Amino acid sequence: MRSFLQQDVNKTKSRLNVLNGLANNMDDLKINTDITGAKEELLDDNNFISDKESGVHKPKDCQTSFQKNNTLTLPEELSKDKSENALSGGQSSLFIHAGAPTVSSENFILPKGAAVNGPVSHSSLTKTSNMNKGSVSLTTGQPVDQPTTESCSTLKVAADLQLSTPQKASQHQVLFLLSDVAHAKNPTHSNKKLPTSASVGCDIQNSVGSNIKSDGTLINQVEVGEDGEDLLVKDDCVNTVTGISSGTDGFRSENDTNWDPQKEFIQFLMTNEETVDKAPPHSKIGLEKKRKRKMDVSKITRYTEDCFSDSNCVPNKSKMQEVDFLEQNEELQAVDSQKYALSKVKPESTDEDLESVDAFQHLIYNPDKCGEESSPVHTSTFLSNTLKKKCEESDSESPATFSTEEPSFYPCTKCNVNFREKKHLHRHMMYHLDGNSHFRHLNVPRPYACRECGRTFRDRNSLLKHMIIHQERRQKLMEEIRELKELQDEGRSARLQCPQCVFGTNCPKTFVQHAKTHEKDKRYYCCEECNFMAVTENELECHRGIAHGAVVKCPMVTSDIAQRKTQKKTFMKDSVVGSSKKSATYICKMCPFTTSAKSVLKKHTEYLHSSSCVDSFGSPLGLDKRKNDILEEPVDSDSTKTLTKQQSTTFPKNSALKQDVKRTFGSTSQSSSFSKIHKRPHRIQKARKSIAQSGVNMCNQNSSPHKNVTIKSSVDQKPKYFHQAAKEKSNAKANSHYLYRHKYENYRMIKKSGESYPVHFKKEEASSLNSLHLFSSSSNSHNNFISDPHKPDAKRPESFKDHRRVAVKRVIKESKKESSVGGEDLDSYPDFLHKMTVVVLQKLNSAEKKDSYETEDESSWDNVELGDYTTQAIEDETYSDINQEHVNLFPLFKSKVEGQEPGENATLSYDQNDGFYFEYYEDTGSNNFLHEIHDPQHLETADASLSKHSSVFHWTDLSLEKKSCPYCPATFETGVGLSNHVRGHLHRAGLSYEARHVVSPEQIATSDKMQHFKRTGTGTPVKRVRKAIEKSETTSEHTCQLCGGWFDTKIGLSNHVRGHLKRLGKTKWDAHKSPICVLNEMMQNEEKYEKILKALNSRRIIPRPFVAQKLASSDDFISQNVIPLEAYRNGLKTEALSVSASEEEGLNFLNEYDETKPELPSGKKNQSLTLIELLKNKRMGEERNSAISPQKIHNQTARKRFVQKCVLPLNEDSPLMYQPQKMDLTMHSALDCKQKKSRSRSGSKKKMLTLPHGADEVYILRCRFCGLVFRGPLSVQEDWIKHLQRHIVNANLPRTGAGMVEVTSLLKKPASITETSFSLLMAEAAS
C-alpha cells in the first residue's frame, strides 16, 4: 500500500483535471432541510467540535500541518478490549445532529482504528460528497506533506478492527467523523451526530466470488494543497459491520501484495453477477454539503433492502440536513446496527481516464425513478445500470414500504398500528418522538392520559390529536362492519328477485333479510273507532264504510263504468267459447294498475293488496254486475251489523281458530266484496294452523247502497231466506262444472232439534258453476233450507228417515247476481282449489251416519244443490239476493253435543275430551266446494254433495308432513324436534352437529347404541304412553315383596330392592335382570327365603315407613295395611279380600278396644292402661302362634296377601288426620327388613338400651303417623317426641311443606307373629 500511495502522489495534473471537471458539476448541489427548527446554516467543522468537548483543535488555515491539527487520531496502543468496549452498546452514539434540539453534551470516544488521515480543515474549494439514502458520506482532506506511513498505519488499524471477532452490532461499527449531520435515531439513547473531515481507509479486499459483496464505493480524493498538486487515492474497502458473524475469510490482510484495487473496481463495475446482500432495514443516513474547495467524491453505503432505489438528489447550499421522521418510520433504528461498505477506486495510468469518467457517468442514478415520499433523506448516488436493474428486482420482492409505488398501508414500528394515509402516520410518529425527546427526562408533568391506550401527554391539544387516531380507527372498523351487513345485490341474473325493487340474490337467507327491510317501510293506517289496521288508505276507507257506516267513496265504485262493461262483454264471450281465449288486459281492482300478464297481476295484488282485497289472485273479470239480476232494494245497516255479530260468534268461545281469524272478521272480510277467493295459504305446519289457513275469509253483508244485497229484518224474528232467482246457461261440460238442483227421486233428510225435514236433490246435465248456493240468515233463530228456484212450491215428502244426522259443512256463498264463473276466472284460481281437500266437522252420531252412507248410492252424491229451509219454508218463502262477490270459505268448528245419548256413538266411539273430529272428503272430479252453515247452535246439520269416499279422524291427524329421522324410524312434526333428536344421535356417537353431513347415517346409527322408540302419528313416543299406562294401573306392582313397602314409581321400588340385595350380600347379577326380578327369584326358593329372614333377623334395625311423598298431593292413597270399615266407622271404601279367622279375631279385638277406649281415664292413666292392654295383646298373639305353624305363616302366599289396597281420601274430616291410629303392636313383626337409616342429627346420640325383662320397667310409646314403637324406660319419651317433631315438620300441613301423612299400621295377619319376632320387635324399639 505504501508503494501504491507513493505512485499516486506523482500523478500528473491531467489526471486531476478529469475529476475536477466531475467535481465542478456537483457545485450546485444543495442540501434540503426538512425538519422544522433547523434554521441555522451548517457551520464549519471547526465550529461543531469544541476544544473542551472533543479535543479537536480549530485549524487556523487550510495549510496547517498534520501534527498540529490531526488530534482526533486515537493512540494505536489501545487494546482490542478497549476498542470493543468503546464500540459496546452502552456507549453513546457517535453521530450528533448539529441542528437538532436534542444535542447532548456528552463526550464521545473513537475506537481503535478510527484515525483521522487528514487535517480538520475546510476551505472554499472543498467538494461535497454525494451519497445514497441510508448511506454515510465523508469527505477527507489530506495535505501533501502528510507522510504516507500514517495512511498505512491507519489502514492497518482499520483492517485489524475489521478482522476482530464480532460480538454485538455496535462492536463492529467503523466510526466516522462526518462532514454533515447524519440523521438516525436510537430507540434507547439520544443520537449524537458529528461532522468530520477525516477519512478512514480499510485494507480489505472485496472479491467478486466472496459471500459479502460491496454495494457501494468509497472514493477518497486526497487534497494535495493550494499548489494544485492533488493526490487521487482510490481504494476499495469493505466495511462489514453486522450483528451476525458473516465470516471474515473473504477479507484480505494488509500483507497481500497481489491485490490490485483498480482492476477489482473495474471488474466490479463491468460484472453482471453482482448480488446484493439483504439485511433488515435500518435508519437511512445521508448528508450532502457543498464545499467550495476541490475535494474528491467519497461515498459510504450500507447493506439494506432498498438498494438505493429510494434515493434522490436534492442540492442545497450550506444547509443543515435533518431527518424527516414523519415520512419514514425506519429512521428510528439505531445507528450502531447499520452496515456499511467502503470502496476505493484508483486507476493507475492516464490512459484509463476516459474509462474512469465513463464508469462514473454510469454510476449516476436516475432520480426520476425515485419517489420523493419514500425517502426522508435525498442524496445523489452513483450506480451502474446493472445495479439499478438488480435494485428494481429487489424492490419488487421487498415490502411495500420500500417500493417505488404507493404502499397500501404505513405501519408503525413502535406499535402495532397501520395507517392508510401517510399524514396519519406522520401525526402518529410525532407522539413517539415526543416520548423520546429530552423533555421525557425532565420532571415535566403529563396530566392528560388517553382512556383507550393509556398514553400521557403534557397538554390537552396533544391528547386531542392523539385521540383522532382511535377515532379514525373506529370509523374504519364501522365502515367495514357496515359493508359486511349490507346485502349484496347480484343483479337481475340471480335466481331470487324482489318484486318490490330491483334486488336479486341466489341466497334464500339473504332474500328473506331483504324482504324484512320492506316490512319496515310499510305504513299502516289505523281506524279511529276500532283496532283495525290497513296497509292502504283505500282499504281503511272501505273498512270505515262497511264496519262503521261511514260515507266514503270507494275507488272501485267510482271507476270507469264503461270500461268495466266492456270487460264484462269480453268475459262473457270468452266464457261461452271456452278458456282458450283470454283477456288482453288485466286491471287491478284496488288501484289503476294494468298489465297484460295474469301472473304479474297476481303478484301485484298479493304483495300490495293482500290484506285489503281478499282476491289476491287478481281475477280481473267476472265480477261485473248485471242489471237483469239486480233487485235494487234498500239495505238495512242494522241487520248488517247483526249479521256481522252473528258470524263472529260462529266459533266456540275458546276455539283456537277464532283467535286465528279474529282480524279477518273485523277487517278483511268486510272488503271481501271485491273478490271471490282468498290467496293461497303457505305450507301447512301445524294441524290447527292448517285448518285456519285452509278456509277463506268469512263474508259479511255490505251496507253500501250500490251492493246487490237485500236483507229483510223481521221484528218477530222470522227467518230470512236467501236464494238465487235466475240462472244463465253456459257450456258446462267445457268448463267441467255441474248444476246442482233438486232431485225428486231421492229425498235426503236433515235432522234438527228432534225434527226432520226433507232435502230434495235433482241432477241436471247443463249447468254453470253457480251450483252451490248459500242461504243463510243473520238471526240466531232462523233455519236454513234447500229449495228449487224454478219450483218454489215444491212440497215436502211425507216419509223420511229420522236417524239421518250429518256433519256440519263449510260452504261457498254464491250470489244470484253472478251468473257464472267461466274458464277465465277458474284459471285465476290456484291449483290447490281445483283439487281441494275438504275438511268438515264430524258430528258424534256416527252410527246413524254410517247407516246413511250405506243406503245412499253414488249417483245421489254426484251433483246436488244445497238450500236452506225451515218449518215455514213454503208458506213464507221470500227470496232475496246475495252478491257473489261475497264468495268466501271459512272453517267452521262445532263442539260436541253434551246431551248426546250413549247409544249414538256405538259404532265410532269418541272420547268427550278428545276435542274436534273431522270428516275427510276428497273430491277431485268436480269443483264441489264446501258450504258454510251459520249459527251452529240452532242448525246442527246440513247436507252437501261430497264424494262417498270419506274417513273420520281426529283433528291432530290433519297435519302435517312428517319428518323422519335418518338414523332411526322416529318421525317428527317440526324441524326443531327433528333437529334436537338428531343432536342426541350425534352426541351419543361422539360427533358434533356439523359432522352429520360428513359421516354416513349408517355409521352414526351403528355407533349409537341407545334403544329408540318409534314415534306415533302425533309425534308422541311409545315410552311416554307406557308411563301413562303405568300410572293408571294398580299400584300393587310397586310393592316390595319382602317388606311390603309401597312406591309410586317402579324406579323407586327398584332402588329399594337394590338396597335389600346389597344387605343380603347380592351385589352382582345379570345386566338384563332388574333387582326386582332377582329378589323375586330368591323369594321363590324356600331355602334362600329362610336365609333372607335369618339375615334380616340378625340385624336389629328399626323399620322405617314406606310412604311415598307424592301421596299427599294425590287423590287416593294406598296404605301398607288394611283399615276395615268397622275399625273406625268412617265409611272408608276398601276392597273385599279374603280374611282368615285369625284376622277376624284381630278385628274383633280391635273393635273391643275401640269400645273400651272411651271409658279409659285421660292423661297418664290412659297411657299406662294402654301399655297394659298392649301386654295383653302380646299374650293373645303367643296363644295364637302356638296353634299355627310358623313355617306356613312365612311362606310366599302369606306375603302376597300381606298388603291390600285402600282408597283413603285425606280430607279434613278424615279421622286419620286427627285421631291416633288404633293398632296392635304385634302387627309390626312383618316390617322386619332393614331400611336406610336417616342422617343422624348433631348433638347427643341415642343410647343403646338393654332389653328390659319386666313389664313394669318398660314404657312403650307409639308414633301416630307411622306406627313406630318406642319401648324402654321413661326416658324413651325423649326419642318419641323428637320422632313426632320430624313428622310435624314434614307433614302435609299449611305452610309446612308436603311430606309424610298419617297412615294406619294395622296388619291383616296377626297370627303370623311369633314370639321370636315379637321379642325382636321389642329389641328394635328399645334401640
Swiss-Prot record:
Record-stated family: Belongs to the krueppel C2H2-type zinc-finger protein family.
Protein name as it appears in the record: Zinc finger protein 644
Biased composition (Basic and acidic residues): 788-801
PANTHER family reported for this sequence: ZINC FINGER PROTEIN, ZINC FINGER PROTEIN 644
Record's function text: May be involved in transcriptional regulation.
Location of region: Disordered: 126-147, 779-804
Connected disease: Myopia 21, autosomal dominant: A refractive error of the eye, in which parallel rays from a distant object come to focus in front of the retina, vision being better for near objects than for far.
UniProt-reported outcome of changing residue 401 to A: In MYP21; uncertain significance
UniProt entry tagged with the keyword DNA repair: no
Cross-link position per record: Glycyl lysine isopeptide (Lys-Gly) (interchain with G-Cter in SUMO1): 346
Superkingdom of origin organism: Eukaryota
GO terms, molecular function: DNA-binding transcription factor activity, RNA polymerase II-specific; RNA polymerase II cis-regulatory region sequence-specific DNA binding; transcription corepressor binding; zinc ion binding
Tissue-specificity statement: Expressed in liver, placenta, retina and retinal pigment epithelium.
InterPro entries according to UniProt: Transcr_Reg_ZincFinger, Wiz_C_Znf, Znf_C2H2_sf, Znf_C2H2_type
PROSITE patterns associated with the record: ZINC_FINGER_C2H2_1, ZINC_FINGER_C2H2_2
Zn finger intervals (C2H2-type): 410-432, 448-470, 496-518, 525-548, 586-609, 963-987, 1038-1060
Consequence the record notes for mutating residue 851 to H: In MYP21; uncertain significance
Lineage: Eukaryota, Metazoa, Chordata, Craniata, Vertebrata
Subcellular location field: Nucleus
Cross-link (Glycyl lysine isopeptide (Lys-Gly) (interchain with G-Cter in SUMO2)): 39, 82, 112, 168, 185, 193, 213, 263, 284, 294, 299, 319, 339, 344, 346, 388, 390, 485, 509, 553, 573, 589, 598, 603, 627, 641, 645, 658, 676, 712, 718, 720, 727, 733, 762-763, 791, 795, 817, 835, 843, 962, 1009, 1031, 1088, 1094, 1110, 1133, 1157, 1165, 1176, 1192, 1205, 1234, 1308
Chief location of this protein within or outside the cell: nucleus
A GO biological-process term: regulation of transcription by RNA polymerase II
Keywords: Disease variant, DNA-binding, Isopeptide bond, Metal-binding, Nucleus, Phosphoprotein, Repeat, Transcription, Transcription regulation, Ubl conjugation, Zinc, Zinc-finger
Reported effect, residue 305 to K: In MYP21; uncertain significance
GO CC term (a single one): nucleus
UniProt keyword annotation of Nucleotide-binding present: no
Record PTM Phosphoserine, positions in chain: 199, 309, 820, 1000, 1189
